[in-house]
Amino acid sequence: TTEKASEDAASGKADTKTADSTALAGKKISVMTPYLTSVTTNQMAGFIKNNLEAEGAEVFVIDTANDFAELASRIEDVVSSGTDGIVLVSADPNQVANQLTEAFDADIPVFGCDSGFIDGMQVNATSDNYQMGELIVRYLFDDLMGGKGTVIALTHRPHPGVVKRCEAFDDIIKEYPDIQLITEQHVPAEQPINDAEEITANLLTANPDKDSVTAIFAAWDEPAIGAAKALAEAGRDKVIVTGVDGNEQAVQMIKDGSCLKATVKQNFEGMADIVCRQMEKYYAGETIEKGEMYAPAELITQENAQ
């Protein structure tokens, strides 16, 4: 099950012997992402590479450095060179749908890890991003803000997971007439910590009154870290920041009592493990259930940060 896969991954057990362990031997697998600079994307790509190589596969990790046009072009390349499988990591398949259709037409299986899912793909392993958004937003609005105040949203809507978290934010804020959204700002994916720090510093200058900003909702941890740095620099340490991902630096900042008060920890190894297991089944000729598979996530606050 998804939960079992996630638990095993969380405890560091990559039990990759559940399917025919020779099924992947000699297969050429293309692990493709535009976001290898992201700590968590890198972690997932590395986990998949190591596990599939342990099964005898030849794994190529291809990073296009935030360039979706280049990603599209590289997908065409691996399809024409006859790859045996594609794993799309942290990338919206809708943005490369035409190229993926070429893979489907060539009977090349496509798996997603922290991506979206489109018809033709086998599986996308992810978190339930809407539910994660709901978890963090309700904690922010109810527990941290007490149902009132102002909030800034730092987002990156090209990422399918971030979009779902933002949709949860958009839906829930309607239920809180005493919470006003000051602005939503797009944070580029290349240097999200630095960019969010700069964006936040500018917003603090534009809202100089100490009480003018109550909270900052960051749709993932890097901008939350950047925002917390800007707040510390400006001496605005009463402003509350939340993130999503549970990356190491963010969890440490929560423990240290910074402005960053909470995040939702995604089980990235759990996602990567689900993908590896499903690939083993696929290449062993077993039927797999197509669609999204979820690795469970948890709310991290100062009480449980480790």
Name these PLM-found stretches:
Residues P93-Q131, L135, T150, N247-D256, ...:
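Flexible loop/hinge segments that line or gate small-molecule binding clefts
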Residues A23, L71, A125-V151, V163-K164, ...:
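Hydrophobic alpha-helical segments within soluble ligand-binding/sensing domains
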Residues E53-T64, T150-A153, E175-I193:
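Short beta-strand elements in bilobed, periplasmic/extracellular small-molecule ligand-binding domains
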Residues G26-L52, V59-S73, D77, S81, ...:
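Extracytoplasmic "Venus flytrap"
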Residues T1-K28, A54, E58, T101-I108, ...:
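Short, low-complexity disordered leader/linker segments with a strong preference
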Residues T40-E55, M132-I136, G161-Q180, D195-I199, ...:
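Short, solvent-exposed amphipathic alpha-helices that sit
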Residues E7, G12-A25, G161, I172-E175, ...:
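Hinge/cleft segment of the Venus flytrap/periplasmic-binding protein
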Residues E76-S80, G85-D105, F169, A189-Q252:
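Hydrophobic alpha-helical
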